[in-house]
Structure formats: C-alpha cells, structure tokens
Amino acid sequence: LRQLGEALGMAVLVGEPSEPESIMRTAILTRLPVRSWRNERHRGRMLRSNLHCELETGSSTVPVLSVHCVHFAARFGERANGEARRIRELGALLEDIERGPAMPHVIAGDFNALSPGDNLEATAFFRLYNRMRRAGLVVEGQNGYLMRRPRNGSNDAEVDAAWLEFGIDPRLDMGIPSLPKVVSRLTRGMPAHTTLDRFLGRFLERWTMERLAQAGYIDVFRRIHPRARGYTCATWLPAARVDYVFASPELAPHAVDCGVVGSRPWPDPDAWNASDHFPLVADFAL
C-alpha cells in the first residue's frame, strides 16, 4: 500500500482494526493536503475502525472536507445478529462524528448492508454457492457453518487450481461468505428468478442504511441513479450493492456523478480481478 501511494503521489493513511481477530485494515489515499487524521478504534463495538481525516480542498465553497472510511462486519449468515453488529458499528461512527468539529463530510466504504428498496439477486447467488459446494470449494466448517475450502500452506497450488477450473480467480476466495449449512439444503435446486429474489429480499434486515438516512445522510449513488442496480459485490457474481458513499446534507448538492468501476461508463476489465468488490467512484464539484 505504501508503494502504491508512492507510485501515485498520494499520502497513505492506514487504520488498524479495533479487534485483534480482524486481519483487515482500512486506508485512505489522497493527493490533497491532509490537515489532520485519526483512527478511532472501538473495542467491543467495531470490528475494524473509523479512519478519518480532514482534507484541504483549495475550494472557496468547501475549503475543508472530512472523510470517514469504514468497513463494517459482514456476518451475513447471522441474519439479524449480523445487522445488529453493523448498527452498533454505525452508532460508534456517528458518535465520533458528533464529537468532532462540524464540517461537510463523506462516509465511504464497505458497509456490508443492503439499502431499503434495493434488489438482491439471491437465487443466482445460492445456485452458484451450491455449485461451489459440489465442487469442493465450499466445505462444512465448525458450528454447522459452510466456509471456503481452507488453505494450510501445502495445498495452496491445489486450491488455486480448483478455483481456476471453477472460473474464479483464486485471489478472490477471501470474499466467499460463511453461511449456515441449512441454507444449502433449503436452496438446493432453487431456480434463479427475480420474483423469488424480491420475496427473499423481504426477509433481510436493512436497519443500517435506514439509520443513516434518518441521520440525514445522502446515498450519493442513489441520488444520481434512482433506478440503477449499482451492484458492487461480488465481482465473481454481481448480486448486491453493499459499498456506498454517503454525503452530509450540506455536501450532497455538490455531488455530480457516482458510478461502479467495472460497469458502464467505466468497463475496466481489471476491476473484475482486483478485489471481490467493485470500486465505487463519486465526483464532487467544490
């Protein structure tokens, strides 16, 4: 990451996680002058952290902009408990913002949460997930959960070859979710159908995005594209929009564009293998 920042001429800010169990960090790369930055860790409330900075934009209308970078816990297999975790993380984030100086700001990152009204291509995902299980790429783990095939150092080449034969870049297997074993049994043979997707989507909690909207934040992608799907996850099967850029109310009118790299109008083929999520780009005219 440091090498990438040096090559791009960007400052690199890295946020260590709140919990030692997390191996993932957050990061902000910027060419704008950094006035200050801080990594807020919340042990017991956040899995990762709230990495934020104040940037000098050089604009007369918005001279200083605050950016908050987050990566909320996934835990899709936990259903309501997983969403409750994300609500706790969001609460810690909003408390940080409330304590800080008031200024225009964005909250951006992987929220691992669905927005009210957004579609989820659940049936196509379950069909592919069950194919992974039949191919031995998803196996039964502990506590009745299914998980990606584990690596132990000696089997890396074999696991990589199996993923390649399946048609998925092996570097992306970190994004394969763990789900209760019963999900596989219930969805075996399920047809891919939009009506069934809408039905299944009704049972998914969407509290995190509702809470952000109640706090006055604007979903920049949805503001620019009221009807577009905007799927950001997963690159091996685009099925859901879980990555967002939210703008504070005073900043939202400055948003002029927002889009997913890897789809129109940014059909970059590298985006399909760089991560298990597609990048999201938002432009603001300050």
Regions found by a protein language model. Name each.
Residues 1-77, 82, 259-260:
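Structured beta-strand-rich core segments of catalytic domains in phosphoester-bond hydrolases
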Residues 3, 88-92, 211:
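Alpha-helical elements of Rossmann-like donor-binding domains used by nucleotide-donor carbohydrate transfer enzymes
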Residues 13-16, 106-110, 219-222:
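Active-site neighborhood of phospho(di)ester-bond hydrolases with catalytic His/Asp-centered motifs
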Residues 19-23, 74-79, 112-118, 228-229, ...:
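Active-site environment of divalent metal-dependent phosphoester hydrolases
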Residues 34, 39-40, 54, 98-102, ...:
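Metal-dependent phosphoester-hydrolase catalytic domains
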Residues 45-47, 82-92, 200-205, 237-238, ...:
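Soluble or luminal CAZymes and related metallo-dependent hydrolases
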Residues 64, 86-111:
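His/acidic metal-ligating clusters that form di-metal
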Residues 72, 110-111, 278:
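Active-site metal-binding loops of divalent metal-dependent hydrolases
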